[in-house]
């Protein structure tokens, strides 16, 4: 009896356990069916907040989303639904695992520049599905985070280290829009030690030996981002906005040995020659033109005034070009003779006339001013002297030859008649003083019986008429 009773009770307990498990499975299936079939929009006033979402695309086929929300319970599930705004039948589901979800497009699909999605959040809580709007205009091209560069390698040679890397084949049409940043350091240093940026449109980089410490082991890593397009594309709304990618796997390399001497590549020599030769030819031509045109420029800007030193030797040899001292010495000679001092000036007189004669083609001789007509009626003035008393003997010999100077008749003014002298009762005291700088023959004036030798000419006062 006791054994049969225990067996019966065991069967009863087993049946109860089976029933409980069955009911649990049925409840779970019903709850899951209710979450799939019922959508309850999230109310803004109460309930659990959705939190913030960050969805970044690799610009090819993948979107990574991060959800900064409270931890989900075991009875809750959440996912993001991407619905195309161009083709509503295209929908992609991204299920969260530990606040992260990754959407991978099928192999036959890629993201295009004009793709536009609506993102909604779906949560199943206690058998009810809650739907909330995340973004109604999600543009993958403005939320780009590229994959890090792959296959980073180093090639150390004499004096340099060449780093190369690769990119996805789908990004090759956009290679000119890719910008890289390189970080390199010694193994014992931090990564923030050395950086190189502004590496655009290339997949290689050269590190010179002078940038690295000799005898050290270095590590380098790389990251990439897509640069903005031109301003015109930005105004039209078709620009790209990118974040820096994650760092690539580091590569190690020894520092290259520095070169002993400065070796300039052959192509740099050729470029230098192409620059130096035209400059040299240009300077040579400029110097040639300068020396060729300098005499002409001097003749244009500077007048060539001849020096009278060759004709007046005493003026420059004795008086050093002082004309006033030279003329003062010439006047002092006749004055000394009048005072009774015998001074011979024949040599100086002849030298002066010889110097003047060299300037003309005929011997020089003193000329008489025909414009000064002597009037015999004037008191105190002798009559007009004759030409035989004025011209020296040397001038008489050249009467038949043409003179180098203008004839004396041409020196006379237009009016041949001299106005009458002023009346004595007019009281006019206008006189002009004539100072003869040269010596005159006294025999030219009648009534003088002095020596025929030259004497100093005295100033002569001539009356000047004030009447028109």
From Swiss-Prot:
Motif Box 1 motif per record, residues: 301-309
Q: Name one GO molecular function term.
A: interleukin-9 receptor activity
- Membrane side Extracellular: residue ranges: 38-270
> Its family?
Belongs to the type I cytokine receptor family. Type 4 subfamily.
Q: Where in the cell is it found?
A: Cell membrane; Secreted
Give the GO terms filed under biological process for this record: B cell differentiation; B cell proliferation; immunoglobulin mediated immune response
Q: Does the entry feature the keyword Lipid biosynthesis, yes or no?
A: no
The record lists the lineage as:
Eukaryota, Metazoa, Chordata, Craniata, Vertebrata
Provide the alphabetized UniProt keywords: Cell membrane, Glycoprotein, Membrane, Receptor, Secreted, Signal, Transmembrane, Transmembrane helix
Q: How does the annotation summarize its subunit structure?
A: Interacts with IL9.
The Fibronectin type-III domain, residue ranges: 148-256
Please give the name of this protein: Interleukin-9 receptor
Q: Which PROSITE patterns does the protein's record reference?
A: FN3 (PS50853), HEMATOPO_REC_S_F1 (PS01355)
Q: Where is this region: Disordered?
A: 407-426
Annotated signal peptide: 1-37
Tell me where the transmembrane regions lie: 271-291
Q: Where is this motif: WSXWS motif?
A: 244-248
What membrane topology was assigned to this protein in its record?
Single-pass type I membrane protein
Superkingdom, taxonomy of origin: Eukaryota
Query: Which SUPFAM superfamilies does the UniProt record give?
Result: Fibronectin type III
């Amino acid at each position: 009896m006791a054994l049969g009773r225990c067996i019966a009770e065991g069967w009863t307990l087993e049946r109860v356990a089976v029933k409980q498990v069955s009911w649990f499975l049925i409840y779970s299936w019903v709850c899951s069916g209710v979450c799939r079939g019922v959508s309850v929009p999230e109310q803004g006033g109460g309930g659990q907040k959705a939190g913030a979402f960050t969805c970044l695309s690799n610009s090819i086929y993948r979107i990574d989303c991060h959800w900064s929300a409270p931890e989900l319970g075991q009875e809750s599930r959440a996912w993001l639904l991407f619905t195309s705004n161009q083709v509503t039948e295209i929908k992609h589901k991204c299920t969260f695992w530990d606040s992260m979800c990754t959407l991978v497009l099928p192999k036959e699909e890629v993201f295009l520049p004009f793709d536009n999605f609506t993102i909604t959040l779906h949560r199943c809580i206690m058998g009810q599905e809650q739907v909330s709007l995340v973004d109604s205009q999600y543009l993958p091209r403005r939320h780009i985070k590229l994959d890090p560069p792959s296959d980073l390698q180093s090639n150390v040679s004499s004096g340099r280290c060449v780093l190369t890397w690769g990119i996805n084949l789908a990004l090759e049409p956009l290679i000119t829009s890719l910008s890289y940043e390189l970080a390199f350091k010694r193994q014992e240093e931090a990564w923030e030690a050395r950086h190189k940026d502004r590496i655009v449109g290339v997949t290689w980089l050269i590190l010179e030996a002078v940038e690295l410490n000799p005898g050290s082991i270095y590590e380098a890593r790389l990251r990439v981002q897509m640069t903005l397009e031109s301003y015109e594309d930005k105004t039209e709304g078709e620009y790209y906005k990118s974040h820096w990618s994650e760092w690539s796997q580091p590569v190690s390399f020894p520092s290259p040995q520095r070169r002993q001497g400065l070796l300039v590549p052959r192509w740099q020599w050729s470029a230098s020659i192409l620059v130096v030769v035209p400059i040299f030819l240009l300077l040579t031509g400029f110097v040639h033109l300068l020396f060729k045109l300098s005499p002409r420029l001097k003749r244009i800007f500077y007048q060539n005034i001849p020096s009278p030193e060759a004709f007046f030797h005493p003026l420059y040899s004795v008086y050093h070009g002082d004309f006033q001292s030279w003329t003062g010495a010439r006047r002092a000679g006749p004055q000394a003779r009048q005072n009774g001092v015998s001074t011979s000036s024949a040599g100086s007189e002849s030298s002066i006339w010889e110097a003047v004669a060299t300037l003309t083609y005929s011997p020089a001789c003193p000329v008489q001013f025909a414009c000064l007509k002597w009037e015999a009626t004037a008191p105190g003035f002798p009559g007009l002297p004759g030409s035989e008393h004025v011209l020296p003997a040397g001038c008489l010999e050249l009467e038949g030859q043409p003179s180098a100077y203008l004839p004396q008749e041409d020196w006379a003014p237009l009016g041949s008649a001299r106005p009458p002298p002023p009346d004595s009762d007019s009281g006019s005291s206008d006189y002009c003083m004539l100072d003869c700088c040269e010596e005159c023959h006294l025999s030219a004036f009648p009534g003088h019986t002095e020596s025929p030798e030259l004497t100093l000419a005295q100033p002569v006062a001539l009356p000047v008429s004030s009447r028109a």
